[in-house]
Amino acid sequence: YYKTSHFATVSGLIYRMSRNAAGLASICILSTMVLVTVSTTMSLYKGVDAYAAVQWPQDMTLTLMTDPRTNTVPDVAPVLRVVDDAMTRTGLTQSNVHGYRTVRFSALRSGDALDLTSKQLTGSSADEYTVMVLDTEGYAGLTGEQVTLAPGEALAWTDGAAFGDTLTLGGDTLRLRQLDSFSLVSGSSIMGLHTLYLVMPDLDSVLELRAQQNAYTSEHGGTRSMLNYTYQFDLSGTDDEQLDAL
């Protein structure tokens, strides 16, 4: 290399090799980023259907929420008439129709007890649960299974660790009958939260639990629960025809 006969030739070759190496390194880095971008985009694209299937298991979901002025769910009859008119206008048909009322609130789990106050709720803790409460009539409409529950008794299913034979909510204790599965699917687990489903004997017991939960949170702090009516169904026709029905 240091010989005068080929010093210029060899030094020029080494210089060009170093420049080429820098260029190749840049190309490798850019190629890697292209692969990462393509794979991430494809994963997101492919995962959209799976996410939608969990979050919205049926073609149409209508939710009527508690009116804060009257603290009641609006009358569902006008909404159902609008749906019927849309079916008549478009010629589409409904199937797998489900209508049910639920009370929904968040709580922090400690063993077989749920803390109804939201002071420690961060939205990221593994002990945070979304609690969905419905009555046996709504459960029968979803599953086709008729069940009879005694006062103070509830069916329970969770996608987290199973609860014991009892559950303490605020100052009240429920006797639990565990379910092996549950047809009402929520997207809470996708967001990192577990979901607990409770089936109460009747609507009055659901409303009583809601009143107790709201009274407890009013005294100790926390978020008041809402009574919602959910109407779900599948539609015949193509995606475009379903959109026209809206």
Task: Describe each model-derived feature in a short phrase.
Residues 26-29, 230-232:
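Glycine- and acidic
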Residues 52-246:
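Basic-flanked hydrophobic alpha-helices used for secretion and membrane insertion
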Residues 21-23, 40-46, 111-119:
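Short, charged low-complexity intrinsically disordered segments located at boundaries
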